[in-house]
Amino acid sequence: MTEIQKPYDLKGRSLLKESDFTKAEFEGLIDFAITLKEYKKNGIKHHYLSGKNIALLFEKNSTRTRAAFTVASIDLGAHPEFLGKNDIQLGKKESVEDTAKVLGRMFDGIEFRGFSQQAVEDLAKFSGVPVWNGLTDDWHPTQMLADFMTIKENFGYLEGINLTYVGDGRNNIAHSLMVAGAMLGVNVRICTPKSLNPKEAYVDIAKEKASQYGGSIMITDNIAEAVENTDAIYTDVWVSMGEESEFEQRINLLKDYQVNQQMFDLTGKDSTIFLHCLPAFHDTNTLYGQEIYEKYGLAEMEVTDQIFRSEHSKVFDQAENRMHTIKAVMAATLGS
């Protein structure tokens, strides 16, 4: 086996939110993931976690996160064990503290995807092993590594990139893009109706990172201002998990913020890429899509099918990169 050097000594560390790491560490993980992607492509084994056991805790359903952690674990030589919402009793029949102490005795690392940021923080506090946040209502750090890896693959650099997020400014993707982008020296623009502006607490964290690392933060409801000369347009679903009752309200608020060809024309450049963490409502080929069309007459929601399937779209590279970046995090924090 050809050995490769991990980017930094992150052994024993947890990834709970982007600001847990420095700019150098975060970009180091991205570069490490790019290397691991080449290793996988070329069939070079990289069993950094041979003999390790990984707990995958999922309160929320997932396709990409579960698949990425599972394949990443196996590629690294570890054994992943999935524990779904019917298998774990976090805070219900058993406290998070007690659960963490039990799992920490049996597993070498723990992934958590759920609602509460406090839950993932407590898992890390009490388990005694590295814990990785696969998504909470507040932050989505593993997604950020994949997103900025995809941007770096397309442009060759991150510092000075203009990134525009269009949609609900209060969700975890918007929070994480602001903070991770600011840490990496990216100019992050959040384009959202004023009523969906991100909370000041998250904006303040991002602005502090921007002043430290050279990025910038813009919050605006002006689409033309937000996308002018931007390198990447990013959107997410208009309604997050657990908010399904708010579809009509969100559609009314965000229908003018759909990512479409007109928006891309406003960028003034041909090289702008499109990003989405998926799943995306870009057609009626799902039960959800059909239901939305029947209720509200919308065949496309946050992005048009034209843009989703265009050469601008890097969403499937982005999805693949979840696996490579998650692998980098696990190997760097748990590997030997």
Swiss-Prot record:
Keywords: Arginine metabolism, Cytoplasm, Transferase. It is found in: Cytoplasm. It holds the Pfam family OTCace_N. Pathway: Amino-acid degradation; L-arginine degradation via ADI pathway; carbamoyl phosphate from L-arginine: step 2/2. L-ornithine binds at residues 172, 236, 240-241. Its EC number is 2.1.3.3. GO terms for cellular component: cytoplasm. One of its GO terms (molecular function) is amino acid binding. Carbamoyl phosphate binds at residues 62-65, 89, 113, 140-143, 277-278, 322. GO terms for biological process: arginine biosynthetic process via ornithine; arginine catabolic process to ornithine; citrulline biosynthetic process; L-arginine biosynthetic process. It catalyses: carbamoyl phosphate + L-ornithine = L-citrulline + phosphate + H(+). Belongs to the aspartate/ornithine carbamoyltransferase superfamily. OTCase family. Reversibly catalyzes the transfer of the carbamoyl group from carbamoyl phosphate (CP) to the N(epsilon) atom of ornithine (ORN) to produce L-citrulline. This is Ornithine carbamoyltransferase, catabolic. The gene is arcB.
